[in-house]
Amino acid sequence: VIARVIAAAGDDGKLERARELGADEVINYTNENIGDAARALTGGRGVDACLEMIGGDILIQSVDALASGARMASIGAHGGEKIELDFVEFFRKHISVHGCGRSTKAQVERVLALMAEGKLKPVIHKTFGLDEAAAAHEVMESRNFFGRMVLTR
């Protein structure tokens, strides 16, 4: 086994989709604390790597889920929330958290090449015309989607 994938989401429908896409375990963060649940799923150890995409309290819970020596990449905090983190945990557990923003041109080219080779398949919730941009934004604000929304001409 190369990796055991644990996915977290706020509703069971999204968790079911995550299982369909290959998640081995799922955590509903509406009902469970991510750190507690991740440790329960890993025999108390925590996770070695985490991709966090929401920010706020979910980021804090994700840091709590990390094992000693783990790494986390965060592309969350889109709402601009300010949070408090206990940096003693970072030192004690030797963890690192990387903030991720825009992709570089080289990264985009690599992703496009993987897609062209059929090795990476994007999950698309819905495609909208440019004249439907407001409707696409409403769907995003509702958080009632799984995958990406695509705008086309």
Give the ranges of each region predicted by the language model:
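Adenosine-nucleotide cofactor-binding segment
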Residues: 1-61
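Glycine-rich phosphate-binding loop and adjacent beta-alpha segment
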Residues: 12, 53-123, 153
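Generic structural signal for individual residues within well-ordered alpha-helical segments
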Residues: 16, 35, 91, 109, ...
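Residue-level recognition of specific faces of alpha-helices
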Residues: 17, 71-74, 148
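Short, hinge-like loop/turn segments at secondary-structure boundaries
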Residues: 23-27, 45, 89-92, 114-117, ...
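CheY-like receiver
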Residues: 37, 41, 65, 114, ...
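C-terminal capping/lid region of NAD(P)-dependent oxidoreductase domains
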Residues: 44, 119-126, 135-153
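A conserved short coil-to-beta-strand element within the FAD-binding core of flavoproteins
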Residues: 129
